[in-house]
A protein has these predicted regions:
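Non-transmembrane, amphipathic alpha-helical segments
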Residues: 85-92, 104-111, 115, 143-146, ...
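A cross-kingdom marker for long, charged
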Residues: 224, 228-300
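Bacterial Sec-dependent N-terminal signal peptides
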Residues: 1-32
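Secondary-structure edge/capping motif, primarily at the C-terminal ends of alpha-helices
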Residues: 104-111, 130, 168-172, 193-201, ...
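N-terminal Sec/ER secretory leader and immediately downstream segment
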Residues: 28-143
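Polar, acidic low-complexity tracts enriched in Ser/Thr/Gln/Glu with frequent Gly/Pro and Thr-Pro motifs
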Residues: 47-52, 61-65, 180, 204-218, ...
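Extended amphipathic alpha-helical interaction segments
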Residues: 150-238
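Generic structural signal for well-ordered, non-transmembrane alpha-helical segments
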Residues: 98, 102, 114-117, 121-124, ...
Length: 300
């Protein structure tokens, strides 16, 4: 099993080749949204292909997607660090550790400052509630406070810290705690994307594409969560995610024949574009349900 940080957001698609979830190729139909360039077919020049993650996304990968989409700075969207003392149960602490991890990755996009340090300290405090030694994060915090000039180094330090956190949980037979952290991170990534870059009045096809592609990631997440059905909290939130999946199941994503590549080692599809049958009404339902679910998660 890879590190928790590696499995985090977006997210091992176990049923990608089954008939129910098979990849669809373009036939005769009218797409609602398309990200294919008009000159992407029939030209001699090679077309650069975008990557579609179908595995569980890391905060670094989520951050890269946010960067491409031009997500604006709005810290009011994040879960305030002041909430940390109110998460008393292990399940709430687990979920919000994942949420704070994605918030940290989001803040990293806009430079390094005290706010970013505050989220690191919060993640450390939350992990303490889970019985994780605070030195996993204390040392990275000290190093970052001493030298805040290298953003990539910061993410590497945080990656190492989360790896140690996951190893500690696994060694103690607490895999379900790691599962809840993964889930919290994915929901937070969806919340930020649907709140800050999705505009229902004038939807950007590339933004719509990234949200729609999460139907693959959600399938992966549900398969991942199945491993921890001995935890009633996991069962509870899995039911919530299955309800959300109903909205994703109402539309299809199509690729042109010969255009799609699958890299199983990196858990990505590569394509020069896609066409979707998703409607704004469905996207709004996804946005609203994610917001409702996220509110429940961050409420003490």
């Amino acid at each position: 099993m890879k590190s928790l940080f590696s499995y985090l957001v977006i997210f091992l698609l176990l049923f990608i080749y089954s008939s129910k979830h098979e990849l669809k190729y373009k036939d005769t139909f009218e797409p609602v949204f398309s990200t294919y360039k008009t000159d992407s077919a029939g030209t001699l020049a090679p077309v650069e292909k975008d990557e579609i993650f179908y595995g569980l996304l890391t905060p670094v990968e989520i951050c890269a997607i946010f960067n491409r989409l031009g997500v604006p700075y709005n810290n009011a969207t994040l879960n305030p660090t002041s909430n940390r003392d109110q998460y008393l149960s292990s399940s709430k602490a687990s979920i919000n550790t994942g949420i704070y991890g994605v918030d940290f990755g989001y803040l990293k996009m806009f430079g390094i400052g005290q706010e970013m340090i505050n989220y690191m300290v919060t993640i450390r405090d939350m992990s303490n509630k889970l019985g994780i030694p605070d030195n996993f994060l204390t040392e990275p915090i000290k190093r970052i406070q001493a030298d805040m000039s290298e953003p990539d180094t910061i993410m590497s330090l945080m990656n190492d810290a989360f790896t140690k956190m996951e190893d500690h949980l696994r060694a103690g037979g607490r895999e379900s705690t790691a599962g809840l952290m993964v889930m919290g991170g994915w929901v937070e990534a969806m919340f930020i994307a649907t709140q800050l870059v999705y505009n229902p009045a004038k939807p950007d096809p590339e933004v719509v594409e990234k949200i729609a592609e999460q139907k693959y990631t959600l399938t992966t997440l549900l398969s991942f969560m199945k491993n921890y059905y001995d935890d009633p909290v996991v069962v509870y939130y899995t039911k919530k995610l299955k309800f959300l999946k109903n909205y994703f199941d109402t539309f299809d994503i199509y690729f042109k024949k010969g255009d799609l590549e699958i890299d199983r080692s990196k858990q990505v599809f590569r394509s020069s574009g896609s066409e979707m049958t998703v409607t704004v009404e469905t996207l709004n339902k996804i946005r609203d349900y994610v917001s409702k679910l996220r509110t429940e998660m961050v409420t003490p």
